[in-house]
Amino acid sequence: MRTAKEIINEFKAIADNPRKAMDDYKKETGKGAVGIMPVYCPEEIVHAAGYLPIGMWGAQKKQISKARTYLPPFACSIMQSVMELQLEGVYDDLEAVIFSVPCDTLKCMSQKW
């Protein structure tokens, strides 16, 4: 049986390098990852299809520049960061992205994808 410390260390390794976790999953299963935008995404459906759901909550980027071309000034920092990362190619290896539309910004996010 694994200890709590071992489990926490595994979670930390995944959080520190989500790309490696995604690549490892693809090697093990032959299926990739599906990006899920916050919130209200049916993660269970992604799991049932055999894919790894990857939460897309952005990152603590110091500079948002490219995303401003596509998003209105009132877009929240999460959506600006997600769009900036997408424009930089960070999400290129995802098999798909699922968008929900609980806010005005998310309604137009898929237009650039």
Regions from the language model: what does each represent?
Residues 1-113:
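An N-terminal assembly and electron-transfer interface module characteristic of large anaerobic redox
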